[in-house]
Amino acid sequence: MGILIFSARVSDLIHQKHQIEYKLARLTRQMRDMQQYSTLIGNGSISIGDLLNSPSSMMGRTMNYLGYAHNSALQYMQANAPMMQQMYAQQMGAQQNPQQAAMMNNYIMRTLYAQGRDRAAQVEMRNLKEAEERLAQEKEQQETLLAEVSEELKAAKQARDQDIKDFAPKYTA
């Protein structure tokens, strides 16, 4: 009877071990994809080529980030542009010509847009760091659980093998 119980336990532990190994492989892939995406965000600007080269698991997040970064940068630019334009007009006064004013206005808008994109990238990097820490913690828990299951599996196999030896008929001559 003990042989059956130990055999069932060994089978269950092998199943648990395979599930944990699958989770570890999935977590490792997620961490690798997130690090690749993090590198992409850290470079500053994302092009369509970068988007196409990003991991498929991060495509949705990349698209969401692009929309968020653009909208956030536009909002930042629209909020700060009038103040900067007014400061420039006060400094230059009547000395500027219309072409120079248009060029400066364009420069102000591009600069503020870039600052807004940088701010969005910083927010995304913080979010990515938190997600990476969460994944690393979950991976560590799974690795600990795998070690425990492996030890229990080893003990169950030894107990099963010992029970088989004890159950075997002993012939004496």
Language-model-detected regions and their locations in the chain:
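Amphipathic alpha-helical assembly segments
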Residues: 61-121
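Extended alpha-helical coiled-coil "stalk/arm" regions
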Residues: 35-74
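Amphipathic alpha-helical polymerization modules
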Residues: 1-50, 96-173
